[in-house]
Amino acid sequence: MSVFLCFLCLLPLILIFLKNLKPSKWKLPPGPKKLPIIGNLHQRRELHPRNSRNLSEKYGPIVFLRYGFVPVVVISSKEAAEEVLKTHDLECCSRPETVGTRAISYNFKDIGFAPYGEDWRTMRKLSVVELFSSKKLQSFRYIREEENDLCVKKLSDLASRRSLVNLEKTLFTLVGSIVCRIGFGINLRECEFVDEDSIDDLVHKSEDVIRNSIFSDFFPGLMGRLIEWIFSERKRLNRLYSEVDTFFQNILDDHLKPGRESSDIIDVMIDMMKKQEKEGDSFKFTTDHLKGMISDIFLAGVGTSSTTLIWAMTELIRNPRVMKKVQDEIRTTLGDKKERITEEDLNQLHYFKLMVKEIFRLHPAAPLLLPRETLSHVKIQGYDIPAKTQIMINAYAIARDPKLWTNPDEFNPDRFLDSSIDYRGLNFELLPFGSGRRICPGMTMGIAIVELGLLNLLYFFDWGLPEKEEAKEIITGNEVALDLVQVFLH
């Protein structure tokens, strides 16, 4: 009986494998050799942004892989990216489904991971109107400035006592405080169910839910679920998801309390739900839509901006020449007697803006843009890309392509002095926020948070590392190492 069950489990895989042995009618992109059944699943590490540069060097700017029975195309050139994100944007604008993204998006009722369709269009339009429009961006300015003032006060106290600073945690707290006030009306210093110190942990657990692939993501039917059960894959995913979901549910419960005074995008959605119950609209908001929006705001808002700020300070500390040039411009332009920084101060700075652009180039928050999925067959650079193929845009590799950039691995804002290249989705050699229909809707908010945060850190303080050993680590290493830094009042 057990042998028969194993045969039934393996039968779909055997049939699909035999089907794949037939010569393909498509002119598929080149790629590494695929093993029976698992394809290139054993080479998933190759899709790490740094490793995938090696793939493109060996096979070209368009590489075809197969993870189990999931076809994947990796794009690593400006020209191919433009075809995907502009020429064939509509045909390539959906999202693949995985167990992790289904969980974190509440059954794809969000913006980031939802497939292309009515739900996605409605949610995106709502987010733009209620959260990311120019008018809303300006209305939240005081929150960004107040939270930066509090961060400066805290750092000034540490500097006066010559205490070391965990800058990584400090930046997660700063961004988390801004995003939670803007998105959810929650002050982390007064909140009953979350505090400042737990923000980075919640972000990392949310990211783990998305990144944790399990067998059913690559293999159909009973076989994938059986292997999941044997290795308890779903249990670990559910445990991570449960912690994150509790946080999101607490945010929603806080909005449902009677007598709530503040109004944010979640309150707007709750009001729309109540009206729809009476009016019977064709599109109906559900609790999953509410939590999907909460998830997007928290994960995309906190995770990306925090990571960018951390990388910016890492590069500046290990490149003191650039830091001095940026600080000289800031302090000469703004003077040395300002008690607080406002967003108006940003308009006076030029080299500072080039430095931010160089950070977006060298360290995009999403080195591999969120994967797209083709809705129909398309041709990219002469190759056939069938429907239901995952497309991964390697923004990291494109931004370090030696054909496009001189000394591409060097942190050098001067490269943009006479350049009109921008990072807002129209120049395909620089794609930190993506492009086309699925461009990050919170781009302007993210830029505002990063620029104001960096300006405060560089105007009021000087930065260094406490010991030579640590300095060597951050200068030569590729990873972020800002757990302990020295801060000095300017």
Curated annotation (Swiss-Prot):
Q: What is its EC number?
A: 1.14.-.-
Superkingdom, taxonomy of origin: Eukaryota
UniProt-listed Gene3D superfamilies: Cytochrome P450 (1.10.630.10)
Q: Where in the cell is it found?
A: Membrane
Write down the required cofactor(s).
Answer: heme
UniProt xrefs under Pfam families: p450
- Keyword line: Heme, Iron, Membrane, Metal-binding, Monooxygenase, Oxidoreductase, Transmembrane, Transmembrane helix
Could you confirm whether the keyword Membrane appears in this record?
Answer: yes
Membrane topology of this protein: Single-pass membrane protein
Molecular function in Gene Ontology: heme binding; iron ion binding; monooxygenase activity; oxidoreductase activity, acting on paired donors, with incorporation or reduction of molecular oxygen
Name the family the entry cites. Answer: Belongs to the cytochrome P450 family.
Q: What is this protein called?
A: Cytochrome P450 71B28
Q: Which organism is it from?
A: Arabidopsis thaliana
The gene coding this protein:
CYP71B28
